[in-house]
Amino acid sequence: MVNRTPGMGGEYQGPEHRRVQPTGPHVRSIIIVRHGRTAYNEQHRLQGQVDIPLDEVGEWQVRQTARTLRDLYVDGRPDIPKQLVVCSDLGRAVQTAHAFADPLGLDVHPDARVRERSFGAWEGLRLEELERDFTEDYQSWRHFAGGELKHGAEPKGAVGERGVEAIDGWSHRAGPDTTLFVFSHGAWISQTLQTLLGMAQGNHDFGAMTSMFNAHWARLTGADQPDGTVRWRMTEYNHGPAIADTDQWEAPTLH
């Protein structure tokens, strides 16, 4: 297994959102998975909310990840017999979710709140183009100072808020006999986790967590609090199947 630890994100915009945490029964654990590779990933283009499908390598990656997730958290956890599957409504995340869910006969629930951060006018551009044509704003973005906001990007705080709203809602639709699987995107995962875990309060630039690799995941477990809410704690981050730690991950032999 590959289990890499946190370090990258973005700036906070606007007043701190006061989250009203739900109470009552909740899922035992949450596994948040990034989609597999796309042509835009391979070309170093900024995807955002452009609806790009997985490429051939990405389809292979998600099959490896789906198999590992089923081995570890379905077959390997008979004490948690049920699974609830949610995904972004963008195709690359939907494909990744179905690679996991279809062999189990599970429904997949798309949710627009789980879609990737919008990068406005920068979407579809190569990183080298951004660096060349928007040098100052590009460097500001890379150093978590918000240069991308001048070009219509969604504020990171807003991404984190809608992400946590989705997590709060779905995690309370089932009980401790269930694992919630959420299939999403790199920026959404970073900004949602930092908001959910309280990291954004001390790091308003959202720079405390690395970006997740394609077809990798994070795992959260819940601790019940005296007031009836749940505190989510991250036990794994940037975890992938064993083959992800080899050169084959980006260049498998497919034919």
Describe every region a protein language model picked out.
Residues 2-28, 65, 117-129, 176, ...:
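Acidic, low-complexity terminal tails and accessory targeting/binding regions
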Residues 2-15, 22-25, 33-106:
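Active-site-proximal alpha-helix that buttresses catalytic centers in soluble enzyme cores
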Residues 30, 83, 178-187:
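Generic beta-sheet signal
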Residues 70-80, 172-175, 224-228:
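Alpha-helix termini
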Residues 63-74, 160, 164-172:
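Generic structural signal for well-ordered alpha-helical scaffold segments
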Residues 87-88, 161, 183-184:
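Short beta-strand scaffold positions
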Residues 36, 186, 238:
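Active-site metal-binding loops of divalent metal-dependent hydrolases
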Residues 101-165, 238, 249-255:
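Phosphate-handling substructures
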